[in-house]
Each structure stands twice: as structure tokens, then as C-alpha cells.
Amino acid sequence: MRALPICLVALMLSGCSMLSRSPVEPVQSTAPQPKAEPAKPKAPRATPVRIYTNAEELVGKPFRDLGEVSGDSCQASNQDSPPSIPTARKRMQINASKMKANAVLLHSCEVTSGTPGCYRQAVCIGSALNITAK
């Protein structure tokens, strides 16, 4: 009597192993596939804006005045780092580049206090120029 259940279990196991199974195929995702966007071309690098400190350096060079340009560096409170004139000059160059200028004639750079929102502020002012090659 004990042999009967053992024989039945052995028969069932061998019967199941004889079944042929097809390999499982991966389930297709219902989420939309991200579309491959074409690579965006990198923005052209802006040409460097040269700073002239003396108007005599421009004698003999044809140029067009594009208007006044400025840059600033702000110290919000007395615990912040002090305002930097080199940072103000760099920001002036960036603003001139946005005006399609390739040079700036620097008029003045100074550190002031009492500007709303700033404990102290460095400001540089100049003229944005487009110098053409001869």
C-alpha cells in the first residue's frame, strides 16, 4: 500500500517532464519607447570681447559704437565675499557679447555702497564696440 503513492508521484513527475514547452517570449512593454531625438548642434562659442582701457588704442581702427554696456558684482551682506572688479569686468564682457560686440572701451570701474539690495557693489561701465578688420 505504501508503494502505490510513491509510484503515482513518480509517474506524475515523469509525465510532466515529457511535455514539450515552448520557450517563454518576453512580454512587450505597453509604455511608449522614447524617441531618439536628433543631436542638437552645440551653440557656437562666443568670440572673446577685448577690453580697451585707452581710446588712443582705437585710433586707425574702423569700429561701430553699439551703445553703453555695464557689469556688476554685488556683496549682498557684510558676511558675503566682497565685490570683485574682475568679476564686474567679466560680466561687462558677457553683456557686450550679447550685443554682438567684439570689444569694449572701458570708461570706469568702481566699488560703491548704498545700492539697493547690495551691501557693496563693484560696477564697470564701458562702450560696446564692433571693430572691423581692414
Swiss-Prot record:
Q: What is the effect of changing residue 7 to S?
A: Does not affect exopolysaccharide biosynthesis
Q: Which UniProt keywords apply?
A: Capsule biogenesis/degradation, Cell outer membrane, Disulfide bond, Lipoprotein, Membrane, Palmitate, Signal
- Which region is the signal sequence? 1-15
- Sites of S-diacylglycerol cysteine lipid linkage? 16
InterPro entries linked: RcsF
Which organism does this sequence originate in? Escherichia coli (strain K12)
On whether Cell division is a keyword of this UniProt record, the answer is no
Q: GO BP, one example?
A: intracellular signal transduction
Protein name, per record: Outer membrane lipoprotein RcsF
Lineage in the entry? Answer: Bacteria, Pseudomonadati, Pseudomonadota, Gammaproteobacteria, Enterobacterales
